[in-house]
Structure formats: structure tokens, C-alpha cells
Design a protein with these regions (language model features):
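Conserved N-terminal phosphate-binding loop of PLP-dependent enzymes in the Aspartate aminotransferase
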Residues: 1-351
């Protein structure tokens, strides 16, 4: 609700954070119960909640054997993935892509698109390729890091076979393939992970944002074969894997695993595709509930966003001026989608 008491339909979800929506009662109870029992303890003690999260995650993970490291954000998760790749391979070059966003810390900003200010130096070399290119991957490359769908760039889908070609190139040259699933993971595409949506399994992947539905948590997954090459103590975190974050993430996984939950996400994504031709929308890109609506020439996404706000609907922007971004709670209702479609059809933009 707004400060004046007015209500809004949130179709942006805080950049894919509000997996279960605002003020989810079940999640609130889980967090309150955990706070009252144990809000924090040292990492020197075993914490059964971490094992419980692993058990909850395991059925939905990509094929293979995985280990996971807990931190507090997507940037941290990506930093840890890069550190693991550099150590496991002994190489010093990371391949990244134009349009990418991986975070604002030193290493993460180094592999983010050049339009975002970076730190003056980083402990590795970056080879930046055009989106969709597999040129430049050779025996000097430690890892290729990418978002399976580039969200901030404008919900840009990968070209056909691009991810499979990257997988083949990495295998050919002994480089690791890393997926940044900070936004595409946790059921967002109607599959638990983007690797399942695109049928390409990476050597490591990261997630955050919606992993604990608004409670700070970053996760770095790495295959057992890579993990066995890493020195003990390579990664560490004071708050990572704390009891509150673990409790929230377990609740998220419980909800995602419910029968028909992911099918519901897929169905809503298809329903939102009906926005094409409604008012200023000329195309819809993306998958599941990570979508970009392309706005017709002569109008901007910002104008449409502001006009929708007058209808009580919150949407988002991105780095593409003609793309309106949607990343709502996965608990969205079909009636909510109909409310958006009606509003688009009846918009007055730029008047």
C-alpha cells in the first residue's frame, strides 16, 4: 500500500525478489518462529538448517552432484563463483558479455556491461564478447559467466543454440560454464532453474534475490568435481547460511515444490503474452514470469510505467527505453493478469 492507504498491484516484485508476494503469512511465521528459537549462531557450530535446505533443494537441482556455498547477495554469490573458477583452473581470464549485469562489487562489476561503472582494477582479466558470440573462448579462459536471460539489458533471450554452443566450447577448452541465475532461478521461468528451461547444465550457477523471498541470501552452486579441486577455506561468510536465511529459503523451496506451482507460473506467463496488441504493447519477450513488454515507437516504457501507476499497477524499467519489465510474485493470480491487460487496453499515455 502507498503512504496514503491506496493499494497497488505489484508486477515488478523488487527485481524478482518477492517470490511469494508481499507480507506472505506463512513465511512470516517461519521467520518469527526461527527468530524466537535462534536468530544467529557462530559458523563453528553445525547447523541442521543448512542440511535441511540442501535436502529441500536437491530434488530440483540440475542433473549431477552439487555443493553449495551460502552468502548474502547475488554479487557475493558471483564473486565466489569467479573465485572458485580461477582457483580450480589456475587460469586468469573470465569471458563475459555485453549487456550483462552481475553486481557492483569489484569482481562482479568487472564482468558487468561497460556502461556500468567498474572498479579501477580486478584480480583477473576480462574478455567481453557480444551477446550471442562464442568466439574468443580458448585455453586461457577460466570460465564463461552469463545470465541465461539478460534481465536488466531488456529481458534479452539467448539466440537459438547459444547456450549449447557455449557448453561445447567450454568442454573443448577446459573452461567452466557459469550461469548467473540471480533473477532466472527459483521457479521464475516456470522451471526451478534456467538450466532446465534451456536444457544446458553449467559447471556452476548462482542465485539470490528470490531465493529467500526477500530475506538476504546468496547461493553459489558448483559441481562436486570442481569443488574437489578447491582449497579449504577459499570462501567464507559471517552471516551467510544463518538460521533466518536458511528458514526462509526452506519455506520458499517447500512452496515451489508444491504440486502444480511451476505449471501455474508457466500458465501465467502464457496469459501475459496476450498483452501483445493491447494498447502500446507490440511484443512480449522472456519466459515464465520474467517478461519484457516492448512498447511501440513514439512512446517510452517510462511513460507506460507512469500511466500504469495511475491505474494502481507497479511495473519496472530496464536499460532498454522501449522495454517495460515484469517480474511479479510467482503467486500472482489470473485475475491480476486480467487487470493489467485491461489497464493496457485503456491507457492514456503522453496526454
Amino acid at each position: 500500500r502507498g503512504t496514503d492507504g491506496s493499494s497497488f498491484l505489484d508486477l515488478y516484485g523488487g527485481h524478482c525478489v518477492n517470490t511469494l508476494g508481499a507480507g506472505d503469512v506463512s513465511l512470516g511465521r517461519v521467520l518469527l518462529d526461527q527468530w524466537q528459537r535462534c536468530s544467529f549462531t557462530t559458523n563453528l557450530l553445525d547447523m541442521p538448517l543448512r542440511a535441511q535446505l540442501l535436502q529441500a533443494l536437491e530434488p530440483g537441482l540440475p542433473a549431477g552432484s552439487w555443493q553449495v556455498f551460502c552468502s548474502n547477495s547475488g554479487a557475493e554469490a558471483n564473486e565466489n563463483a569467479l573465485k572458485m573458477a580461477l582457483n580450480a583452473t589456475g587460469r586468469q581470464t573470465i569471458v563475459a558479455f555485453a549487456g550483462a549485469f552481475h553486481g557492483r562489487t569489484a569482481g562482479a562489476s568487472a564482468v558487468t556491461d561497460e556502461a556500468t561503472p567498474a572498479w579501477p582494477s580486478t584480480p583477473f582479466d576480462v574478455r567481453r564478447l557480444p551477446w550471442g558470440s562464442t568466439d574468443g573462448i580458448d585455453a586461457s579462459v577460466a570460465a564463461v559467466l552469463l545470465e541465461p536471460i539478460q534481465s536488466l539489458a531488456g529481458v534479452v533471450m539467448p539466440p537459438p543454440d547459444f547456450l549449447k554452443d557455449l557448453r561445447a566450447q567450454c568442454d573443448r577448452h577446459g573452461a567452466l560454464l557459469l550461469f548467473d541465475e540471480v533473477q532466472t532461478g527459483n521457479g521464475r521461468l516456470g522451471t526451478m532453474w534456467a538450466s532446465q528451461y534451456f536444457d544446458v547444465i553449467p559447471d556452476g550457477f548462482t542465485t539470490a534475490k528470490g531465493a529467500a523471498a526477500g530475506f538476504p541470501l546468496g547461493l553459489t552452486f558448483i559441481t562436486n568435481s570442481v569443488a574437489q579441486q578447491l582449497p579449504e577455506g577459499l570462501c567464507g561468510s559471517t552471516f551467510g547460511g544463518g538460521p533466518l536465511a536458511m528458514s526462509a529459503a526452506i519455506e520458499v523451496q517447500r512452496r515451489l515444490a508444491a504440486p502444480h506451482f511451476l505449471a501455474h507460473v508457466q500458465a501465467l506467463g502464457k496469459q501475459l503474452q496476450q498483452a501483445v496488441g493491447k494498447g502500446p504493447v507490440i511484443a512480449v519477450r522472456g519466459a515464465g514470469l520474467l517478461l519484457g513488454m516492448e512498447i511501440e515507437a513514439g512512446r517510452s516504457a517510462r511513460e507506460v510505467r507512469d500511466a500504469l501507476l495511475n491505474h494502481g499497477i507497479l511495473t519496472g524499467l530496464c536499460n532498454h527505453p522501449q522495454i517495460l519489465r515484469l517480474s511479479p510474485a510467482l503467486t500472482l493470480a489470473s485475475a491480476d493478469v486480467q487487470q493489467l491487460l485491461w489497464a493496457l487496453q485503456n491507457l492514456e499515455v503522453g496526454v
